[in-house]
Amino acid sequence: TEGPYFYIPMSNATGIVRSPYEYPQYYLVYPAAYAVLGAYMFFLIIFGFPVNFLTLYVTIEHKKLRTPLNYILLNLAVADLFMVIGGFTTTIYTSMHGYFVLGRLGCNLEGFSATLGGMIGLWSLVVLAIERWVVVCKPMSNFRFGENHAIMGVTLTWVMGLACTVPPLVGWSRYIPEGMQCSCGIDYYTRAEGFNNDSYVLYMFVCHFLIPLVVIFFCYGRLLCAVKEAAAAQQESETTQRAEREVTRMVILMVIGFLVCWLPYASVAWYIFTHQGSEFGPLFMTIPAFFAKSSSIYNPVIYICMNKQFRQCMLTTLFCGKNPFEEEEGASSTKTEASSASSSSVSPA
């Protein structure tokens, strides 16, 4: 059922469909489902906010973390905070009411904030992959990665994020309630007259999913080849072989994290776009959105907390200036000292 600035994925033959801006949507799912949605958003906030805020705080506290290669990690933390503050808090409030109680303006603001945070996070992973490839594989022999390059990378993420999220505010597509009608996103559902949804969805799918996917696979594929070649040249070195295994495991983890975050959402959005008019349950789009929003937790875990340098500084900050695991961390780093330069450049952080 399509109405002004909303789309409900069910027929209104019985006359029960109501505007998600004005009435609870309990006819879509049981009221308990909205409580589960609110609880899940609360879970993302209480875990996502501290770990991302701590990343920024620890970087301010420890000068050695303020290196050009870490700029993009800080940007990733900012993007996740944008999602947490601008998107998740709103969804908790609306799920308590069972509909998008904040109206059309609130839908635009929530859809813009959550999508912008997600897009900046996505492009941060792309820039991170490019930076690791450039530093480790050295495709440009005389190139030296510096602060200006790091700032350019961060700027690119915001430009691409805004290039994705601003058009729906000015008439190229639009933000509408989606899933259980308690949060807003891009209109993949309709071909509403005057919004050119078809061209926008194609642009979104190609420029903000396929291209990032290809770039990430290419960069990490080349990086793995470079690490394996280095390990093959030093077959006698146990530390090099261990470093290769660590890097391989980390790259696989990073790629899986990206796919878990964006593949379900992009696939379902594309299916809905190509099967417009067909009926589907409200959970059909809600569940993939859960995966995308969960990135505010597992992105910092993969890319920041698994970074030895960040982890040591975080523990030092949390334990008031002393890292209780310092001896273990030191022993671990000593074992891989011979390959520390390459592994630190490769690891997600």
UniProtKB/Swiss-Prot annotation:
Alphabetical keyword list: Cell projection, Chromophore, Disulfide bond, G-protein coupled receptor, Glycoprotein, Lipoprotein, Membrane, Palmitate, Phosphoprotein, Photoreceptor protein, Receptor, Retinal protein, Sensory transduction, Transducer, Transmembrane, Transmembrane helix, Vision
Under the GO molecular function aspect, what terms does this record hold?
11-cis retinal binding; G protein-coupled photoreceptor activity
Q: Which residues cross the membrane?
A: 34-58, 71-93, 108-130, 150-170, 200-221, 250-271, 284-305
**Protein function:** Photoreceptor required for image-forming vision at low light intensity. While most salt water fish species use retinal as chromophore, most freshwater fish use 3-dehydroretinal, or a mixture of retinal and 3-dehydroretinal. Light-induced isomerization of 11-cis to all-trans retinal triggers a conformational change that activates signaling via G-proteins. Subsequent receptor phosphorylation mediates displacement of the bound G-protein alpha subunit by arrestin and terminates signaling.
- Disulfide-bonded cysteine pairs: these are 107-184
Bias kind Low complexity: ranges: 331-349
Per the record, lipidation of type S-palmitoyl cysteine is found at: 320
Write the protein's name.
Rhodopsin
The subcellular localization recorded is: Membrane; Cell projection, Cilium, Photoreceptor outer segment
Q: What is its main location?
A: membrane
- Classification of source organism: Eukaryota, Metazoa, Chordata, Craniata, Vertebrata
Give the PROSITE patterns listed for this entry.
Answer: G_PROTEIN_RECEP_F1_1, G_PROTEIN_RECEP_F1_2, OPSIN
Gene Ontology terms: biological process: absorption of visible light; G protein-coupled opsin signaling pathway; visual perception
Q: What does its PTM field state?
A: Phosphorylated on some or all of the serine and threonine residues present in the C-terminal region. Contains one covalently linked retinal chromophore.
**Where are the stretches annotated Disordered?**
326-349
Q: Where is this motif: 'Ionic lock' involved in activated form stabilization?
A: 131-133
What Gene Ontology cellular component terms go with this record?
membrane; photoreceptor disc membrane; plasma membrane
Q: How does it sit in the membrane?
A: Multi-pass membrane protein
Q: Which InterPro entries match?
A: GPCR_opsins, GPCR_Rhodpsn, GPCR_Rhodpsn_7TM, Opsin, Retinal_BS, Rhodopsin, Rhodopsin_N
Q: Where is this site: Plays an important role in the conformation switch to the active conformation?
A: 110
Q: Name one Pfam family in it.
A: Rhodopsin_N
Instruction: Using the UniProt annotation, give the residues that carry a glycan (glycosylation sites).
Output: 12, 197
Stretches assigned to the Extracellular side: 1-33, 94-107, 171-199, 272-283
Which ranges sit in the Cytoplasmic compartment? 59-70, 131-149, 222-249, 306-349
Carrying N6-(retinylidene)lysine, the residues are 293
